[in-house]
């Protein structure tokens, strides 16, 4: 297991007026914090339990954490993954030593299959977050933060099922009760605000977020008790703020994180009223993101920050029609990323062509100027 570094972030420090440090769990074994809990859980098994092996269900990080931990301890592992799981994550899980079984369309269906296998075979089911040993393993993140940043005043942690937040909060509050601990969820998959208000785990109203690593419908009972007693605040962040945070970490800290790993950064950058005390530590919980998804999220972040604009312009279908448009965009100091034309739209008149251009812009104000200039030049813009 790696003792992951904490890295100072000048960009975030300047934004929020506090010294901000990044706890880089994206640099942990398998690319996320998950092996910490999985290793502790599997290490605690008896010899007879170890002989039957372990089983888990996951679409990504937990799968790899269990596979690596079991292999490190010399124990057989089987991991059930949804049939739609990404090929890189399937390949990584196998590479870490697990037998991978693709069953079910969702993680919940895969978990049902894993539970059936555990009952039939005697294998021990390793839950991703709802077990005391899992929480204890994740607590090592909090212990390291205290050792690396003795004066830390606020810690922000991504929040899904609750195992990571519960463990970090338990470690911090045991040694430094005054440290402020904040959990961060995606607004579009936020079970925790309703759960804390109800005093018990409650299912999320929706599950539609790019942050699949924290997309958990029902909080765990074990972590819920810790979060309820120890965590100072739980906040939620939008999809736009998550993609912008991922882009910021990539550009300024030179670190690759997955959307779930960027949620705590998103809280710093998008919630101006967030209460922070002293030195701030932000946990980057993971960095496992498919290259294609990374491209999509980067584009999403660029759009959200006004740095990427796609518009469709109607131009005359004659020689020089496209040139005139591109010259105008050049004069507006716009970089053209892509150009697509179509003559088959039912909304076009004879002698017209629709040109879809993707542009690199310098912010929302620049985009407004571009649209205004095109309109003044007589172009129909969509």
Model features per residue range: what roles?
Residues 1-382:
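PLP-dependent amino-acid enzyme catalytic core
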């Amino acid at each position: 297991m790696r003792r992951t570094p904490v890295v100072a972030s000048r960009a975030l420090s300047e934004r929020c007026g506090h010294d901000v440090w990044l706890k880089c769990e994206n640099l942990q074994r398998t690319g996320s914090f998950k092996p910490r809990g999985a290793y502790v859980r599997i290490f605690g098994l008896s010899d007879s339990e170890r002989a039957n092996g372990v089983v888990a269900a996951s679409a990504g990080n937990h799968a790899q954490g269990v596979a690596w931990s079991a292999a490190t301890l010399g124990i057989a592992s089987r991991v059930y993954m949804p049939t739609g799981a990404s090929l890189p994550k399937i390949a990584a899980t196998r590479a870490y030593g697990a037998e991978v079984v693709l069953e079910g369309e969702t993680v919940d269906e895969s978990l049902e299959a894993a539970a059936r296998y555990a009952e039939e075979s005697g294998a021990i089911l390793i839950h991703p977050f709802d077990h005391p040993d899992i929480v204890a393993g994740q607590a090592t993140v909090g212990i390291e933060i205290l050792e690396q940043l003795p004066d830390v005043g606020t810690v922000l942690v991504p929040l899904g099922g609750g195992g990571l937040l519960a463990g970090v909060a338990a470690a911090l509050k045991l040694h430094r009760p005054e440290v402020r601990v904040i959990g961060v969820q995606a607004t579009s998959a936020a079970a925790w605000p309703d759960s804390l208000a109800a005093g018990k785990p409650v299912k999320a109203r929706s599950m539609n977020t790019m942050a699949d690593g924290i997309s958990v419908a029902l909080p765990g009972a074990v972590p819920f008790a810790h979060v309820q007693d120890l965590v100072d605040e739980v906040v939620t962040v939008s999809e736009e703020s998550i993609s912008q945070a991922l882009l910021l970490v990539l550009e300024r800290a030179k670190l690759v994180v997955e959307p779930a790993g960027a949620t705590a950064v998103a809280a710093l950058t998008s919630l101006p009223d967030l209460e922070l005390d002293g030195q701030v530590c932000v946990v980057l919980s993971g960095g496992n993101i498919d290259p294609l998804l990374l491209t999509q999220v980067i584009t999403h972040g660029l759009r959200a920050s006004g740095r990427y604009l796609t518009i469709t312009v109607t131009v005359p279908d004659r020689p020089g029609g496209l040139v005139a448009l591109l010259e105008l965009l050049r004069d507006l100091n716009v970089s053209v990323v892509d150009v697509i034309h179509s003559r088959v739209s039912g909304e076009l008149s004879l002698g017209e062509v629709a040109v879809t251009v993707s542009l690199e812009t310098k912010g929302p104000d620049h985009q407004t100027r571009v649209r205004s200039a095109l309109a003044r030049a007589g172009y129909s813009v969509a």
